[in-house]
Amino acid sequence: DYVCGPLQRLKVKRQWAEAYGSGNSREEFGHFIWSHVFQHSPAARDMFKRVRGDNIHTPAFRAHATRVLGGLDMCIALLDDEPVLNTQLAHLAKQHETRGVEAAHYDTVNHAVMMGVENVIGSEVFDQDAWKPCLNVITNGIQG
């Protein structure tokens, strides 16, 4: 099995920084990820009624997408600071426990994030063997 060791964590942080970018590219990146999520899990839209999951072009959903990516950005930044990362993951776990998010949903989002990063930085440099275990560290922490 692949591990999320110190080198993998640094690589994920570097590749994320390149993919996440800034400004308008962040909105496009979020749109790519959520389009992928809902394409592969249409029923997941129901979990986002409060933020207009029925239409990812609305200001309400775009704001939600920005918050999610901001949270992921923080978690990735903390990959090499485990005590602080674990505190952040516990906070996110509390926010998600009442939302009915299942393991398969996290898998779908992980896959969409990896596709998004690969789409921006290119398949020749994207390191799935680092991303998979490191995203699992984050999503396992959120699942509690």
From Swiss-Prot:
Q: Where does heme b bind?
A: H96
Q: Where in the cell is it found?
A: Secreted, Extracellular space
Heme listed as a keyword: yes
Gene3D superfamilies, alphabetized? Globins
GO terms for molecular function, please? heme binding; iron ion binding; oxygen binding; oxygen carrier activity
InterPro entries linked: Globin (IPR000971), Globin-like_OT (IPR050532), Globin-like_sf (IPR009050), Globin/Proto (IPR012292), Haemoglobin_extracell (IPR014610), Mb-like_M (IPR044399)
Query: Which keywords accompany this UniProt record?
Result: Heme, Iron, Metal-binding, Oxygen transport, Secreted, Transport
What SUPFAM superfamilies does its record include? Globin-like (SSF46458)
Q: Which domain of life is it from?
A: Eukaryota
Q: Which PROSITE patterns match?
A: GLOBIN
Q: A single GO CC term, please?
A: hemoglobin complex
Domain Globin residues, every copy: 3-144
Tell me the protein family, please. Belongs to the globin family.
Complexes and interactors: Part of giant hemoglobin C1, V1 and V2. This worm has three different extracellular Hbs: two dissolved in the vascular blood, V1 (CA. 3,500 kDa) and V2 (CA. 400 kDa), and one in the coelomic fluid, C1 (CA. 400 kDa). V1 consists of four heme-containing, globin chains (B-E) and four linker chains (L1-L4). V2 consists of six globin chains (A-F) and C1 consists of five globin chains (A-E).
Recorded protein name is: Giant hemoglobins B chain
- Its source organism is Riftia pachyptila
